[in-house]
Amino acid sequence: MSDAYIYDHVRTPRGKGKKDGRLHQATPVWLLRTLFQAMQQRLALDTSLVDDVVLGCVTPVGEQGADIARTAVLDAEWAQTVSGVTHSRFCASGLESVNLAAAKVKSGWEDLVVAGGVESMSRWPMGSDGGAWALDPRVNQKLGFAPQGIGADLIATLEGWGRPDVDAFAQRSHQRAAVARAEARFNRSVVPVRDIAGLMMLDHDETIRPEASLEAMASLKPSFAQMGAMGFDATALRKYTTVERIDHVHHAGNSSGIVDGAALMLVGSQAGGAAAGLKPRARIRAAAVIGSEPTIMLTGPTPACRKALAKAGMSPQDVDLWEINEAFAVVPMKTARDLGLDMDRVNVNGGSIAMGHPLGATGCILLGTLLDELERRDLSTGAATLCVGGGMGIATIIERV
């Protein structure tokens, strides 16, 4: 079986996912076109050597529908022979793309695959695609559906974390992201987005707040208390009977931001990279996905990480750096507690609380950020993990070469 290597990673800046966000006027295919062209240029890549493109998109409707992967390949004027597929594993879609690409390469069926994802949340809001999970009353009742924020607040209640704990984590995310941006740590991977006239739209992550304070966060109202009062708390408490009530601690300041963004990663075999004249940056050592309890929904990273670590023959302490998606503050907090991680090795450049979570792209962004930081610090191994809608987890372990 062939090894799968990472050859390059590019991403857009993340723009505020509202109509006044700097990337709102950029269509999803324009974001991808920007990245495909940048990857081709910086690698002097003969695109006819690429076998396939695998892209994640959580809301594949409107401009993001109809297999945007293939549309973007053609719009970027890559070789006509490069195929494309679009998929969704909810929030994990970007990392799932990388794992699917790695599996294709390891099987020997393909030698170079571009993986990644896109989400324009300002143009196509989360939930625009509907789905039986939330909208079919029979399914809803049978599965015990509750919004993710209810699950996040339930985790905080079960783990004994209050507002000061989750707010402190959120403040640290902004502080670390601000330092990383000031020190140009993201510059290797970030590709500025320009409009059709060549004018700059955005060249940095738009939502980082260096001034984020605990006092300001304390003034924010809980985001999910009203949803809980409408009946979702009762739904969750029917399964979690040791809890008398859910303490609603999450709000806009300690949850992931709604943003626009895209990311790509070139994955290939050693032979495929050599044919393209490229040197590998890292080897994809192991990957795993797993299902978890769907009402609380956000506890999947821990078992997914344990599954991936077992495949790699590693313990959590063998991993130098971790990227744990900050969907809500409690997700990395719980995963780190479960695995016994040193928080100085977790999300060292901030995360989705500070920079946002463009659903289909985030997993790819996390893995690329992880690789850049491993190289900057001259470290060896890293792991990226995300919680996933519907009660799932995903994890990928990489090793520099």
Question: What is each stretch, according to the model?
Answer:
Residues 10-13, 24-25, 29-34, 42, ...:
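N-terminal extracellular/periplasmic Venus flytrap/periplasmic-binding protein-like
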Residues 87-118, 156-186, 265-271, 336-337, ...:
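Active-site-proximal alpha-helical scaffold in enzymes
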Residues 1-17:
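N-terminal amphipathic/basic leader segments beginning at the initiator methionine
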Residues 14-41, 59-62, 85-99, 111, ...:
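Active-site pocket-shaping loop/turn-to-helix segments
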Residues 12, 16-19, 103-159, 229:
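Glycine-rich loop/linker segments at domain edges
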Residues 26, 57-111, 142-150, 218-257, ...:
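Conserved catalytic cysteine-centered active-site region
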Residues 22-112, 118-134, 190-204, 295-296, ...:
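Conserved beta-ketoacyl condensing-enzyme motif
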